[in-house]
Amino acid sequence: MGLDNIVVKGARSHNLKNIDVTIPRDKLVVLTGLSGSGKSSLAFDTIYAEGQRRYVESLSAYARQFLGQMDKPDVDSIEGLSPAISIDQKTTSRNPRSTVGTVTEIFDYLRLLYARIGKPVCPKHGIEISSQTVQQMVDRILSYEERTKLQILAPLVSGRKGTHVKVLEDIKKQGFVRVRIDGEMREVAEEIELDKNKKHTIEVVIDRIVVKEGIETRLADSLETALQLADGRVVVDIIGKEELLFSQHHACPQCGFSIPELEPRMFSFNSPFGACPTCDGLGVKLEVDLELVIPDRSRTLSENAIAPWEPISSQYYPQMLEAVCNHYGIDMDTPVEQLPDHQLEKILYGSGHEKIFFRYENDLGQVRENEILFEGVIPNVKRRYHETSSDYIRDQLEAYMAQKACPTCKGHRLKKEALAVLIGGKHLGEVTKLSIKEAKTFFESLELSKKDFSIARLILKEINDRLGFLMNVGLDYLTLSRSAGTLSGGEAQRIRLATQIGSSLMGVLYILDEPSIGLHQRDNDRLISTLAHMRDLGNTLIVVEHDEDTMLAADYIIDIGPGAGVHGGQVTAAGSPEEIMNDAKSLTGQYLSGKKFIPIPSERRQPNGRSFTVKGASENNLKQVNVEFPLGVFIAVTGVSGSGKSTLINEIVHKALAQKLHRAKDKPGKHKEIVGIEHVDKVIDIDQSPIGRTPRSNPATYTGVFDDIRDVFAMTNEAKVRGYKKGRFSFNVKGGRCEACRGDGIIKIEMHFLPDVYVPCEVCHGKRYNRETLDITYKGKTIADVLDMTVEEALEFFTNIPRIKRKIQTLVDVGLGYIKLGQPATTLSGGEAQRVKLASQLHKRATGKTLYILDEPTTGLHVDDIDRLLKVLQRIVDNGDTVLVIEHNLDVIKTVDHIIDLGPEGGDKGGTIVAQGTPEEVVEVEGSYTGKYLRPILERDRKRMDSRIREHELQRS
């Protein structure tokens, strides 16, 4: 039994209720259940942690200190465990040197390919650079037919200015008769005078030969003479036909551009042998950006239009600016956009050699007067950035700088010698700029000589296989040069999935966390067949997933529940998809079988007449699109992966509105303008990033309800008698907190060779507060007891205090009744963090002018959670505000009022508007993939709703 199954006994990690689970081996197993029900606790914190721990335990103590040690999970036993590999969404590298090519190891094979069969070509003259022996040169010349006339020349001067008198004298002394100067034959005996200001080419005629039998020796002697004379170069003029250039060195015979011996490290931008010397292999340089220096050109100089010189701490730069304006007669009360170019030029780039009178008065009234050379705002920011040793100042100045493509390597990251090596007419930089689909076509259609093919056969197989795996997981639109840090969680996970398939391991336990995130329904089938392929290799796959198609394709489903948090942690159902559907206890089964479903709204909202329009959006792959966003409705932006959704919403709409409305520093993506901004007064991005980076942040502090709770404790009679104010009940400041653990409740003990151990503070026993503070009670509970309550318990406890009840009620509304008020932010999942943020917005008053942006809010959510989330989002829209989601989930798309569908494909073939309108209008559009997959869902759910209505009518009658 142990061999066919993984048997978990007594799992108690987090909220798991001492459960026993049997997971079949070598099968595709889906773990599902509500958000917070304990799926990740079972998959990652129990099974993966134990599999990884057992493997690491087998290594030496020395090796263990370099590996992330896993805590021993709280479980009685796990049998039948294999080495475990976790593919989650958190581990994308933020390193700018990490690209799709390096992460998938395709780049390593490309380097090897270029080093072995690449053809060096002079970038200036387009001549192939190769070193040849005299024997090879003779054979090449003798390949011409008999009686071909030719002359052998030694190129002494190639395109250099001067009279070259000495060169000509040397030729005469050595007894040569003819010379070719600038393409014209001359006798050496002539008086030759050259114009010293023009470039000249001088070639000595060594020999004139007619191709015939027995000429080899003479030909070889003449070639050797020419090579000796011209430093290893020779020109063979086939009279009336062509000229051949030969070189004994790895160098261009015309300009001498040379390339060292080709080796893989020469093509690595992470090695000093291959990296571009200007940008050190990053492909970009940080340059001062004029748009960030003057973010709002409608402001005047006296209104601090020049952002880096705002008078925050010192008046030095504002006074200098005033001196420059006085000197050049520049009006400081004219908006910057109306200033003449020559005046703005002086402010931005300096006075050159012209001196300016500068009088500076500091805060103490001391005056300094001087004649100065004014360097200009942009050179000033650049100089201070490079000269400062303060990280704080460097971070401040970086806000006015932007990444620009490196001028030397044009963003290709490699030095010019590496970029001079071509295969199929493309250098390595150009190949990595191709999308994965284009790269696959390029390598499959590559025409190679027999010799090159035999060398490259295995390398090309590896490259093509890996490109194929990436296409199978729906990533054909990515380029190999795409920085890993810019990938979404789902993309990064699918890349690692493709890399794992490339390794072709068997007998491994893979644990995946929602691989379908960010994937359009169209590409889902390819992902599922990839997972099935990994299973068929002989691996066990445990997939934490909510996607209906993946669940139906699984061999075995384990439904964790029945609720979330304290109400979860049990196995409610386990079996094949059919068995789950027929199990009345399984919430997932009810949704899979259609007994439960998310209803379609009976009617779509009409826009309120107001809208804003983005014009000429052209960032990344957007094709100069104009998009109108109606306000007062629920909008979904849809489209296949890589079609430009995130670019349009996150890079342009969010950043441009935040810059205009909240004076944010982030520079928006390329677009002409946004019309109608006056209809929006706030833009709020509710993403899945943590609500805090430390355990001190928790739902109570984030939603602001903790302030009100502390007020309640400060108002108790005992607190008043003791003179305790609200601050006494904060665990972040001295006074009321336990000083032994500084209000953390736990103490970290560092262990070498073992993971760090966290133990409860022995002074306060994890309560965070000192004894005096805990003497104060409200309705019999201390402040520590309140933090330990679940949201549901707190709602009941504070039911008589409206302002607290209102804030806690919003947490219940978004489905977070099970989390504790004081639960550390670091332990919340992405979906939970996002819902805490939503809750904190819900209790604020609606203005009717707020735009909420959510990027894939359904990540990590079960269908039942999505139902609850949609009710909250619809409530926000009912209040008059606008909700804009980027989404692939058809359950969400079917309930919105307005769809903007981008596409038609991903990458270069995307970036246009395919369809827009209500879901009913979009399904009628021929080229819309979203419409194609949405149509059957709308039809299915309409039928379900009709039958539901009929059932109700029958029950009534």
From Swiss-Prot:
GO terms for cellular component: cytoplasm; excinuclease repair complex. It is found in: Cytoplasm. A zinc finger (C4-type) spans 252-279, 738-764. The UvrABC repair system catalyzes the recognition and processing of DNA lesions. UvrA is an ATPase and a DNA-binding protein. A damage recognition complex composed of 2 UvrA and 2 UvrB subunits scans DNA for abnormalities. When the presence of a lesion has been verified by UvrB, the UvrA molecules dissociate. GO terms for biological process: nucleotide-excision repair; SOS response. Residues 309-587, 607-935 form the ABC transporter domain. Keywords: ATP-binding, Cytoplasm, DNA damage, DNA excision, DNA repair, DNA-binding, Excision nuclease, Metal-binding, Nucleotide-binding, Repeat, SOS response, Zinc, Zinc-finger. This is UvrABC system protein A. ATP binds at residues 33-40, 639-646. HAMAP family: UvrA. Forms a heterotetramer with UvrB during the search for lesions. One of its GO terms (molecular function) is excinuclease ABC activity. It comes from Halalkalibacterium halodurans (strain ATCC BAA-125 / DSM 18197 / FERM 7344 / JCM 9153 / C-125). Gene3D superfamilies: ABC transporter ATPase domain-like (1.10.8.280), ABC transporter ATPase like domain (1.20.1580.10), ATP-grasp fold, A domain (3.30.1490.20), P-loop containing nucleotide triphosphate hydrolases (3.40.50.300). CDD domains: ABC_UvrA_I (cd03270), ABC_UvrA_II (cd03271). Its main location: cytoplasm. PROSITE patterns: ABC_TRANSPORTER_1, ABC_TRANSPORTER_2. NCBIfam families: PRK00349.1, uvra. Belongs to the ABC transporter superfamily. UvrA family.
